[in-house]
């Protein structure tokens, strides 16, 4: 059975008044610039200091959106493309957004001395409660990529009451096996640090094409003044412990797993999905996204993120302004309901008055 898609016209929430003064416009522009820059803080934790950037004035009734980046990146290079994306503004204007840089990874970070004992992945996750306490955040929605996804996963398992939702991009819940360990030892002999990290971040197809994005990140890593810090973070991630996820030891909140088709951690994400509660987990496998979907497909990830937040009870469907106006999009998906049966369904933003796709009560696999 097919459903006819209809175009929905929605007016601006706050249309510009004809007589609005230039002074008001200038004040709005100045406020927008300040919001884009964010407020930077240094937060003391039991395992050292963290560099934290906060955007937005805060809403005590809603969780903060808290992000942690991957190895070889900082919060800006990992998340600016996504969170500055035009359609994402419909989301971020309703939440406080908090970007955490892993120890020593922020732009301009001092280089650690030789022999410095870098924090383990578990210890980095233990630094997060101090951040929540510093800003008086009661709960968060975590958004992590790669190593950041692992850190947020560990934090959520240890502090389930503090996390209302998780978006995990390229998550690998497993510790390295002997084969991985041997492969890394061989890689150390034949590949530079930047090559190892680039292979961690991007798919083989992207590496073969040597895209401009890869060239930019390779140059940034190679020329980074804090290259030693990056290496320490990389080694810490390689030494991570197994999260030991299973249906009896899993997240208590809605989770959205995201991975690019043919991405380095595609198999790990699929395995992680099999270990989570199917009634609270959504799984998105994004075509043509490569290893960094937040950089290559910000529009599709924004769309999925908004549905995820709406499924949690925030931002009702009536708030769909830019996302509804910009285009009518159909997503083909297959999902299992209560683990007992599966079916196919076409999800449309613009049909039937803006009906939403399945909430986090379903496991959904989407090829965008």
Curated annotation (Swiss-Prot):
One annotated Gene Ontology cellular component of this protein: cytoplasm
Region Disordered, residue ranges: 330-368
Coiled-coil spans in chain: none
Pfam families: Ndr
Keywords: Cytoplasm, Developmental protein, Differentiation, Neurogenesis, Wnt signaling pathway
InterPro entries reported for this sequence: AB_hydrolase_fold, NDRG
SUPFAM superfamilies, A to Z: alpha/beta-Hydrolases
Compositional bias of kind Low complexity: 330-339
Cellular compartments annotated: Cytoplasm
Biological-process GO terms, alphabetical: cell differentiation; nervous system development; signal transduction; Wnt signaling pathway
Family to which the UniProt record says this protein belongs: Belongs to the NDRG family.
Function in brief: Contributes to the regulation of the Wnt signaling pathway. Down-regulates CTNNB1-mediated transcriptional activation of target genes. May be involved in neuron differentiation.
Classification via PANTHER family: N-MYC DOWNSTREAM REGULATED
Protein name stated in the entry: Protein NDRG2
Native organism: Danio rerio
């Amino acid at each position: 059975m097919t459903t006819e898609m209809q175009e929905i016209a929605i007016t601006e929430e706050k249309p510009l008044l004809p007589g609005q003064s230039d002074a008001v416009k200038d004040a709005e522009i100045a406020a927008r610039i300040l919001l884009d820059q964010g407020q930077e803080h240094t937060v003391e934790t039991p395992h050292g200091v963290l560099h934290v950037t906060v955007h937005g004035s805060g809403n005590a009734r809603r969780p903060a959106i808290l992000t942690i980046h991957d190895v070889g990146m900082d919060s800006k290079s990992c998340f600016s493309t996504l969170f500055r994306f035009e359609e994402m503004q419909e989301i971020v204007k309703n939440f406080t957004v908090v970007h955490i840089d892993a120890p020593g990874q922020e732009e301009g970070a001092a280089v650690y001395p030789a022999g410095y004992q870098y924090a383990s992945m578990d210890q980095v996750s233990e630094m997060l409660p101090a951040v929540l306490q510093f800003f008086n955040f009661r709960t968060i929605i975590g958004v992590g990529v790669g190593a950041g996804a692992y850190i947020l996963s560990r934090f959520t398992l240890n502090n389930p009451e503090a996390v209302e939702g998780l978006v995990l991009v390229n998550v690998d819940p497993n510790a390295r096996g002997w084969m991985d360990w041997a492969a890394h030892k061989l890689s150390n002999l034949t590949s530079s640090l930047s090559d190892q990290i680039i292979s961690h971040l991007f798919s083989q197809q992207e590496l073969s094409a040597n895209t401009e994005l890869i060239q930019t990140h390779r140059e940034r890593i190679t020329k980074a003044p804090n290259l030693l810090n990056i290496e320490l973070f990389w080694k810490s991630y390689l030494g991570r412990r197994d999260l030991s996820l299973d249906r009896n030891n899993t997240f208590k909140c809605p989770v959205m797993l995201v991975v690019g088709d043919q991405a380095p951690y595609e198999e790990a994400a699929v395995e992680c999905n099999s270990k989570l509660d199917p009634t609270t987990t959504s799984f998105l496998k994004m075509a043509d996204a490569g290893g960094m979907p937040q950089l290559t497909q910000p529009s599709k990830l924004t769309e999925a993120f908004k549905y995820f937040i709406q499924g949690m009870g925030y931002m009702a469907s009536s708030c769909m302004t830019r996302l509804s106006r910009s285009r009518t999009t159909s997503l083909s998906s297959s999902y299992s309901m209560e683990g007992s049966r599966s079916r196919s369904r076409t999800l449309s933003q613009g049909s039937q008055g803006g009906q939403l796709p399945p909430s986090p009560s379903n496991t959904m696999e989407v090829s965008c």
